Swiss-Prot record:
The keyword Thylakoid applies. Keywords: Coiled coil, Membrane, Thylakoid, Transmembrane, Transmembrane helix. It is a single-pass membrane protein. This is Thylakoid membrane protein ssl2009. It comes from Synechocystis sp. (strain ATCC 27184 / PCC 6803 / Kazusa). The chain crosses the membrane at residues 10-30. It is found in: Cellular thylakoid membrane. Residues 50-84 form a coiled coil.
Amino acid sequence: MAQKDNFAGGFLLGTVIGGVVGGILGSVLANRAATQSPDREKLDTEGVGNLDSEENIELARRRLEDKIAQLNLVIDDVRDQLGHVNELNNIKEVQEEHR
């Protein structure tokens, strides 16, 4: 019976944590997608055909660097959140062992 209680508690905790992480990740990505960089606006207004190949390469490189930076920020946020969850789980395990 105790295993079923632990499973249910763990399942609910995982659901809550997954929802929080997913919500934060979704809101961060949606916020970043809503803001456009000047390079994207330049491409939207002038079109890709009006730029020479060096400018196209430079714009693509900058966009790629921006996306990598965004992904790194999100990864760091999730890593921090999971670290806090692991700390809480370790504290609970220690408390249960001392009972």
